[in-house]
Design a protein with these regions (language model features):
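Coiled-coil phosphoacceptor/dimerization helix of two-component systems
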Residues: 10-21, 41, 84
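Glycine-rich ATP-binding loops of the HATPase_c
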Residues: 158-164
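Short alpha-helical Gxxx[C/S/T] motif in the catalytic ATP-binding
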Residues: 146, 150
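Conserved catalytic submotifs in the C-terminal HATPase_c
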Residues: 32-36, 54, 58-68
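Short conserved segment of the HATPase_c
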Residues: 121-133
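Short, small-residue-biased leader/transition segments that mark boundaries at the very start
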Residues: 1-7, 145
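Helix-loop junction within the histidine kinase core
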Residues: 22-33
Length: 186
């Protein structure tokens, strides 16, 4: 039946997420570093996800005029961003979803973010949103592990992850990673 197919997919996703988390934490997750043009990467994420975001939601990308290059694991960045964008899409019914990045030349960090005008997160729940099995809404699909996996990946990339949210107004999920290994463009 269709219901059992949905259940099977959710169970498989949960198992895969748990396996992914244990791989990361045991040190068995591999990271593959390469030079990444962040503008091209944001363009790619934008094109991929623009097909999944409902037409009534404005989808915006915000990048600096000049391309910026960092040495990182592009697949892991995409994994985090996909999680952020999927969550924004689940909880935003009108307004916009914005993805982009900013460079902080004083700290040698890149901050990558997704901002939305979704329902926001209640203040009392905000300290626990990056923990395992956190789900804002038990009726919305998902395992509650995506943000925990994202947090673990960001930690392995020597960065920080967080969220700023106002209930009823929206959220901004962000992570920062150092770019010192790639240097600044001339």
């Amino acid at each position: 039946s269709a219901a059992s197919d949905v259940y099977k997919r959710q169970l498989l996703k949960l198992i895969n997420d748990i396996l992914e988390l244990s791989r990361i934490e045991s040190g068995n997750m591999t990271f593959s570093y390469s030079t990444c043009n962040l503008n091209n990467w944001v363009d790619s994420m934008y094109l991929t996800h623009s097909l999944l975001i409902p037409k009534e939601i404005e989808f915006i990308k915000e990048v600096p005029d000049a391309a910026f290059f960092i040495n990182t694991d592009v697949n892991r960045l995409s994994q985090i961003m996909t999680n952020f964008l999927n969550n924004a899409t689940k909880f935003t019914k009108s307004g916009y979803i914005k993805l982009g990045y900013e460079i902080d030349f004083s700290t040698y960090e890149v901050s990558i973010y997704v901002e939305d005008t979704g329902k926001g997160i209640p203040k009392e729940e905000q300290p626990t949103i990056l923990e395992r099995f956190y789900k804002q809404d038990e009726f919305v699909q998902g395992t509650g592990l995506g943000l925990s996996i994202s947090k673990t990946i960001v930690n392995k990339l020597e960065g920080q992850i967080g969220a700023d949210s106002v209930e009823g107004k929206g959220s901004t999920f962000w992570f920062t990673i150092p770019y010192r290994t790639c240097g600044r463009p001339e």
